[in-house]
Amino acid sequence: MRRSFQAAVLLSLAILFVALATSFGWGENADRLITNKAVDTLPDEMLPFFQASRQFLVQHVKRPEPPLPAPNALPGTTKRPPDTDVALPDTDFIQLDHYGPFPFTALPRDYNSAISKYNRRTLAQYGLLPWEIGVYSKKLTDSFRDHNWGDVRINAAVLAHFVIAAHDPFNTTINFDGKASLQPGVNERFNTGLIDRYQLFFFVKTNDAVFIHDPTDYAFEMVLTSHSWVEPILLADRRAHVGLSDYKEDYYDRFYAQAGAILVNQVSNAATDVGSYWMTSWINAGRPQLPSQ
């Protein structure tokens, strides 16, 4: 029985977690650090199960590409309408600045309203991240309610991936790789280079997980906050490179001095928010008793 369960989980992972050939966002160390810290934000009733699942979650949070609901599926459902023809190669971003100036009020937060205004193809092209978070919050709730602990682990990892992605400022902008501002690679220097070099020296300060009343709306607030840091990071990158011909240690020391506080803030908030989404799904499922492992 145990071997059959393990085989089923591995089969699900083979389907769900496919590495993307070209992708942007937090580096592997950041994803794992945030997920590890998120476990410790949970209430006592959830801790034993998630502590036992910690290694699984940390291992599988990076770059899952699950079979996603159709672009015009309602948040919280996976129903695929018959006229859907839009492929979704990657949905862990939303390029908010396509929709006008901050705070992007031209983009409806209601999915059906957004489709009516812009069409499915446009939404798919410029990213579905907040709605995907809503979808996978519901999927995790359903897994908790069904006592399907294998699916709980899988959906918790997928949900964590999307929530973490929402805290990377470069997942929220058309200038996702810095080329538009003539700063190619600034995204990787911020979300991977700084983490890899300095994570042992900064303190990730998390808060206890809290209940999220509207997972999709809260996801929009997360990406808005992340987007507000794009310009300060770009400015820090430009200043750090003044007088230098490369992006080596002198550059990174300068960059961290100017943008390190933003990085630590985003990592800390991401860990708290991942835990909050997990707890919210559990509460919405009726607070089922979780197995200890």
Question: What do the PLM-derived regions correspond to, one by one?
Answer:
Residues 19-158, 174-250, 254-268, 272-293:
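N-terminal, motif-rich segments that launch catalysis or mediate targeting to/interaction with membranes
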Residues 1-11:
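Bacterial N-terminal signal peptides that target proteins for export
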Residues 10, 35, 167, 171:
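Alpha-helical and His/Cys-centered functional microenvironments
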